[in-house]
Amino acid sequence: VHLSAKSTIHPFADSLNETVGEILVKGSNINPQAFLPTLPKARLNFDATTIPSFTDGVALEGSIDLENDQAGFADENHIPVKRILGEFIIDDKGTVKIEDIGVGLLKDGSIDVSGSIDTAQDQLKLALGINNTGADDFVRQNIAGRLNGSIDVKGETSSPVVNWNLDSGFARTDGMLFFQTDKQLGQRTLKLDKVRLVPQNGGELNAKGSLELFKDRKLQLDIVSKAFNPARIDPQLPQGSVNGNINLTGILAQEKFAGKMQFAPSTLNGVPLSGKADVAYENKHLSRALTDLTLGSNIVKTNGSFGKKGDRLNIDITAPDLSRFGFGLGGLL
């Protein structure tokens, strides 16, 4: 590990602007995990340059050039960033202005960041450009498609509003999430609003919901499917035109969940899909399991409960053609 700083001071300069010259900070072979074992592993080398400036409302100009020689997947406790390169300005009011900072990710993806963070007013306004970014830029799991588009983050630093518009080439998604804050009680709720997933020629999914980030952590999620074709998202998923809705509620702190599903006339793998389900679960107890699903000649029906003494769960399955469910299934049951 090596860390050094260098600057030049001119104590007899004519102006404050000229008293402190360029400040150079260099670091090499820095591994966060060496300082705290729970931190991710990396080998960081960086050059940071700052130039004090006391004219035109600017207090500090700077740049950062950081490289990570041991970039790796986040799910292996590495940092999935290869390089960060860009410039910034801090004005005399404490506002940080970011000018096109580029973030090189693990594989082929990159993120461009610009905007401002106003520390005095507790406000931020950031624009992120997403370029050719895939799941393999972050984790080991490989998910089809690479994203291009934009993410905008603005509002209070503790409760920002996030809008996105992203396209994978065969599907696009847009939507908004924000944090609703009760400042008196110090409680925050995460809200999902107008979330859409739209495959090319594959219908769409719409979702909205909320998650309380305090006490019992109450959850509510509503999903509506309109002629949705799962195969347009991933070729390994079954072809179809799915219409229906899912309503999920829960209390995470109590491991308590309830869900309802209703299919309107739909198709999956070339045969009709219909039915409904009503399920309730609490702390390892399936208290309600009402399902009545039909996929072609396959029928699945359940009713009852499971998990406690005296419970009885009735299951009636007729599945002469398992291939209709996809996922490589075949035969009969």
Q: What is the predicted role of each segment?
A:
Residues 1-333:
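Interface amphipathic segments
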